[in-house]
UniProtKB/Swiss-Prot annotation:
The keyword Cytoplasm applies. It comes from Macaca fascicularis (Crab-eating macaque). Keywords: Cytoplasm, Membrane, Transmembrane, Transmembrane helix. One of its GO terms (molecular function) is iron ion binding. The chain crosses the membrane at residues 29-49, 77-97, 134-154, 168-188, 215-235, 237-257. One of its GO terms (biological process) is positive regulation of protein phosphorylation. This is Fatty acid hydroxylase domain-containing protein 2. It is a multi-pass membrane protein.
Amino acid sequence: MKGEAGHMLHNEKSKQEGYIWGSMRRTAFILGSGLLSFVAFWNSVTWHLQRFWGASGYFWQAQWERLLTTFEGKEWILFFIGAIQVPCLFFWSFNGLLLVVDTTGKPNFISRYRIQVGKNEPVDPVKLRQSIRTVLFNQCMVSFPMVVFLYPFLKWWGDPCRRELPTFHWFLLELAIFTLIEEVLFYYSHRLLHHPTFYKKIHKKHHEWTAPIGVISLYAHPIEHVVSNMLPAIVGPLVMGSHLSSITMWFSLALIITTISHCGYHLPFLPSPEFHDYHHLKFNQCYGVLGVLDHLHGTDTMFKQTKAYEKHVLLLGFTPLSESIPDSPKRMQ
């Protein structure tokens, strides 16, 4: 009996071990296959992008050299065009389209994607004019002088108007570093501005809009504009000694992203603005850009318990998330 019991126990143990090893092999196979598929996909994507970059690189290099010839001896003018005028053109072009919807409610199909339903329908014209004046002041009297002072530092560090354009892989590396630096500097400067000492006199101005619109992304006290808007974006290119082409693309991208974060519409195929929109609604959650530091510091715990968190995804269809994931009746009231 003891022998049979021991034999059965041994068989059972062998079966369990076999099951465990089988599970481990299946897991390893699935993970390995997934990893290989991801690497193959990523290599394919980067190969096609690099091929496109390389094929068009000759064209852009020729155009860049033509610009250098045109502005020879006056590269600082070229720098100001690329670092200020082009990003501002992107900012106002995009916000011009959004302002049409904000002020008229048309086209109707875009209004369906509004995050805070019933707010800014239409936007208060007096409040809007005041905000636009502040944004223009910040751009002309704060951003422009900061870029003026930035140029000699970049010139000393690596010459932003050097003849050779950056490679595709180098620009991707720069973009990753710019994003990381912006996340760190913006998160901590933003949290600092929420300290009672600074909030009432400085940051409260930006939070006048509890339901934000795109153009108010730069609506802020001048001190906040320097510390929390400009510095997080400028430090990256300064550290990397970046080329003007990288600076132009980064500044333009940063302005478009912050506009989307404040626009008040969760539009298809664009980054989700739910995270920062919730910050304007509640004030004490979601301080960062990417949400990484909010996760580490626990400043997104309330957000994760809301419908807004469920909606914080890339919308890949045309059905508004307010319809597919409706708010609870309590909030709708």
